[in-house]
From Swiss-Prot:
Top-level taxon in the UniProt lineage: Bacteria
Enzyme Commission number: 2.7.1.130
Organism lineage string: Bacteria, Pseudomonadati, Pseudomonadota, Gammaproteobacteria, Enterobacterales
Cysteine pairings via disulfide bonds: none
Protein name stated in the entry: Tetraacyldisaccharide 4'-kinase
Record carries keyword Lyase: no
Protein biosynthesis among keywords: no
GO molecular function: ATP binding; tetraacyldisaccharide 4'-kinase activity
EC class: transferase
Function description: Transfers the gamma-phosphate of ATP to the 4'-position of a tetraacyldisaccharide 1-phosphate intermediate (termed DS-1-P) to form tetraacyldisaccharide 1,4'-bis-phosphate (lipid IVA).
An annotated GO cellular component: plasma membrane
Length: 328
């Protein structure tokens, strides 16, 4: 229902306009206060890069963060990552992730990013505290990448990158809750790079596609072509589950059942195992896998995806960030 409201297919969005106007006024006032320096943002002693979005829901932001961190690491840059830690609840903040940190403590995306990149990752509702925690433990870090937080103006940033779903784009264009917008589309004029996940990019936008890798068994780590798996039940607890189901079909998999779950939904063995019957194979997203690995069964697999950016702009962006991190 919410997708129909946000896309404008349902007339119910008009009923929510008063709340959207209120949301827009408050969010605009907050940004203006920081812009006019009525409120002071905290500036880190190293450059900060924000990877965020203008809309609620999954846009492919986390794969972009992983891509960015890995690309900078390959260039010899030491990177730290901070996040709000949505879906997690730590005993205290800031929380610096370790091999023992669970998604219940830190949230799905931070654990995924930590496991993928081995970069220092910290979470806190106050992102400046997360930055301070990383720099205290890892003083060699040269640049901070923040996963989400475009609207978290308390943390000063040097570079802003926005990720857009190229198919859904901005829906009906309205602020939450009548539409999907956290900020209006005009905000794109002030960011440094716009990355478009799928669809047809517009002038000045960087095209991106999510490339699936081999399926990975949660228990054994065995890899295989996902099309070799039989009697597949697909599960996705991400911002936009249909994207994952479409990826499976693109890989030649015709799931016997597709199970969309809420983003950041907590998972347990009983609930997940109930999704599959004898002889079926469960295939989930990598984001779900970080929550299920501790209690996984032998017929549970996940499909990792990697961001692939096209054109000349990604190289220019990486050159800019490398120069910033190197102090040039």
């Amino acid at each position: 229902m919410i997708e129909k409201i946000w896309s404008g297919e349902s007339p119910l969005w008009r009923l929510l306009l008063p709340l959207s106007w209120l949301y827009g006024l408050v969010s605009g006032a907050i940004r203006l206060c920081y812009k006019l320096k009525l409120k002071r943002a905290w500036r880190a002693p190293v450059p900060v890069v924000v990877v965020g979005n203008l809309t609620a829901g999954g846009n492919g932001k986390t794969p972009v963060v992983v891509w960015l961190v890995e690309q900078l690491q390959q260039r010899g840059i030491r990177v730290g990552v901070v996040s709000r830690g949505y879906g997690g609840k730590a005993e205290s903040y800031p929380l610096l992730l370790s091999a023992d940190t669970t998604t219940a403590q830190a949230g799905d995306e931070p654990v995924l990013i930590y496991q993928r990149t081995d970069a220092p990752v910290a979470v806190s509702p106050v992102r400046s505290d997360a930055v301070k925690a990383i720099l205290a433990q890892h003083p060699d870090v040269q640049i901070i990448v923040t996963d989400d937080g475009l609207q978290h103006y308390r943390l000063a940033r040097d570079v802003e990158i926005v990720v857009i779903d190229g198919v859904r784009r901005f829906g009906n264009g309205w602020w939450l809750p009548a539409g999907p917008m956290r900020e209006r589309a005009g905000r794109l004029k002030s960011v440094d790079a716009v990355i478009v996940n799928g669809g047809v990019p517009r002038s000045g936008e960087i095209p991106m596609h999510l490339l699936p890798g081999q399926a990975v068994n949660l228990r054994t780590g065995t890899r295989c072509d996902v099309a070799q798996l039989e009697h597949v039940v697909a599960m996705a607890g991400i911002g936009h589950p249909p994207r994952f189901f479409a990826t499976l079909k693109m890989c030649g998999v015709q799931p016997e059942k597709c199970v969309p779950l809420a983003d950041h939904q907590s998972l347990n063995h009983a609930d997940v195992s109930a999704l599959v019957s004898a002889g079926q194979t469960l295939v989930m997203t990598e984001k779900d896998a970080v929550k299920c690995r501790a209690f996984a069964e032998e017929n549970w697999w996940y499909l990792p995806v990697d961001a692939q950016l096209s054109g000349d702009e990604p190289a220019k962006l990486l050159t800019q960030l490398t120069s910033l991190a190197s102090g040039n």
